[in-house]
Curated annotation (Swiss-Prot):
This is Large ribosomal subunit protein bL36. Belongs to the bacterial ribosomal protein bL36 family. The gene is rpmJ. Pfam families: Ribosomal_L36. GO terms for cellular component: cytoplasm; ribonucleoprotein complex; ribosome. GO terms for molecular function: structural constituent of ribosome. InterPro entries: Ribosomal_bL36, Ribosomal_bL36_sp. Keywords: Ribonucleoprotein, Ribosomal protein. PROSITE patterns: RIBOSOMAL_L36.
Length: 37
């Protein structure tokens, strides 16, 4: 899980979602997981 000021999808399987007011990227590849904060 990477914490970044701006989250961007890395590959075509990355999905941007909102959870508890936080913007997150979830993906099949665990290295692509990101959270804004």
């Amino acid at each position: 899980m990477k914490v970044k000021p701006s989250v961007k999808p890395i590959c075509e399987k990355c999905k941007i979602i909102k959870r508890k007011g936080k913007v997150m990227v979830i993906c099949e590849n665990p290295k692509h997981k990101q959270v804004q904060g």
